[in-house]
Amino acid sequence: MGVVRFGVSIPEELLEKFDRIIEEKGYVNRSEAIRDLIRDFIVRHEWEVGDAEVAGTITMLYNHDEADVVKELLDLQHDYLDEIVSSIHVHMDEHNCLEVVIVKGKAKRIKEIADRLLSLKGVKHGKLVMTGTGRELV
């Protein structure tokens, strides 16, 4: 894998802000920060396309005392056995549980799974975090 050097013209004020941020985040140089931005751009594009193979996590916080929420969560997860790779269940306190579902598949299908899980009555908060499978990144 070769490395290509290229130039970018941007306003000075924008570059100064960028330099401050990459220093705060601990980047050793602009190149690595720009590579990360490009990788993120590629991953987001893969998700937008909808038919790309992607991965992600669906995190849900819910009250297990809420009527039928546990049964509905499990039933829905069993509807997507091909896409759900694993799940982690954590008891936050005597009523609240945190569940992280690890998913892999077509972006459109993963979004569908997240929408269905996160919209269940009893799910207090949730989020889909998207990434790629790694094959599309260098």
UniProtKB/Swiss-Prot annotation:
The keyword Transcription regulation applies. It holds the Pfam family NikR_C. Transmembrane segments: none annotated. Keywords: DNA-binding, Metal-binding, Nickel, Transcription, Transcription regulation. Coiled coil: none annotated. One of its GO terms (molecular function) is nickel cation binding. HAMAP family: NikR. Belongs to the transcriptional regulatory CopG/NikR family. GO terms for biological process: response to nickel cation. Its cofactor is Ni(2+). Transcriptional regulator. Binds 1 nickel ion per subunit. Ni(2+) binds at residues 78, 89, 91, 97. It comes from Thermococcus gammatolerans (strain DSM 15229 / JCM 11827 / EJ3). InterPro entries: Acetolactate_synth/TF_NikR_C, ACT-like_dom_sf, Arc_rbn_hlx_hlx, CopG, CopG/NikR_regulator, Ni_resp_reg_NikR, Ribbon_hlx_hlx, TF_NikR_Ni-bd_C. CDD domains: RHH_NikR_HicB-like. This is Putative nickel-responsive regulator. Signal peptide: none annotated.
